[in-house]
């Protein structure tokens, strides 16, 4: 239930941030596309779905959507510049690619060492570290391969609408 709640909140925040249902759909699609292969690799490694692996997935659910959000936000910026969806997706993905890759491998380097802890705690954290690292890696694969492609076909050209009135009031 915690995984579903985290996913629903992540999608809601994306919708509020991007204010575009199509872009939210692309970002929301990234979540299952990263989690399903994670479950497959967990099965190959002999892991079960337990409290530790679900905790790991619950912690990284925001990260799983984050890579796609970064890509989509940059694509939306290019769309507001008047580019076609295909052109915006390709140029935005090229612009932001290295940053997304660097962020992902930084997160992997944070989570993966927990898989190599020794002792009693290490027995529990093996599945935690591997599950988090694998999920974050598949998030990168989805963000770099599928998000730009889906954006090129699903998003529509748009003009900049500016900030919502309540944000302008808040910022002064």
Task: Enumerate the predicted regions with their spans.
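Hydrophobic regular secondary-structure detector
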Residues: 1-172
């Amino acid at each position: 239930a915690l995984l579903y709640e985290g996913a629903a909140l992540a999608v809601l925040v994306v919708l509020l941030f991007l204010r575009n249902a199509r872009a939210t759909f692309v970002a929301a699609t990234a979540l299952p596309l990263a989690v399903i292969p994670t479950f497959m690799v967990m099965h190959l490694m002999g892991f079960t779905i337990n409290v530790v692996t679900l905790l790991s997935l619950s912690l990284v659910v925001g990260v799983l959507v984050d890579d796609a959000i970064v890509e989509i936000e940059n694509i939306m910026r290019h769309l507001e510049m008047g580019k076609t969806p295909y052109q915006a997706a390709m140029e935005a993905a090229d612009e932001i690619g290295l940053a997304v890759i660097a962020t992902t491998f930084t997160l992997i380097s944070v989570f993966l060492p927990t898989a190599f802890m020794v002792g009693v705690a290490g027995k529990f954290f093996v599945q935690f570290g591997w599950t988090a690292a694998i999920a974050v890696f598949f998030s990168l694969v989805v963000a770099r391969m599928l998000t730009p492609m889906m954006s090129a076909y699903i998003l529509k050209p748009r003009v900049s609408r500016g900030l919502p009135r309540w944000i302008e009031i808040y910022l002064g």
